[in-house]
C-alpha cells in the first residue's frame, strides 16, 4: 500500500505525504494562534506548510517564517521552494545588504532570522502589518530579550496569526 500525498493547489504534487496528525494540527493553527510541540522529525514544518497553503488559497498572503539560525532559515526556505507551487519566496539573513533586503521584503513568503527581522522593523524597512501569518520555529527561545519577544510584542492587538513550533519547552529556570 503506497502512502497518500497531500493534494492542494499550492503544494507541489507528490512532494508531501498525508499524516492525519499534521493535518489536524494545521487545521487548528489556521483558526487560532497556536504553539505546536512535537518531537524532532515528526513534521512541524509540514504542519506550517499546510497553514501557509491555506493562507495562500484564501488570498491571505504575507507569511513570515522565522528561525533562529541561518542554517534553519535556509532549510525552511529550501523546503518551501521545493514544496510550494509559487516562486514568490525569499530568504533574508544578516548577510544580505540593506538594499537587497529592501527588495526581498516585498515577497509573499519570507524566511528570515529574528534578529534581522526585528532590526528591519525598527528601521522601517519592513512593516509588520504586511504579514497575515508569522511562524516562530524553535519558539521555546521566546524568552527574555530574544528577538522573538520583541516581534511578538509588536503583534499584540493586531489580527496577525501566530504559529509557534518547538520540540522542547523551556524549564521554569530558563524562563
Regions found by a protein language model. Give the residues of each.
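N-terminal helicase ATP-binding lobe
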Residues: 1-175
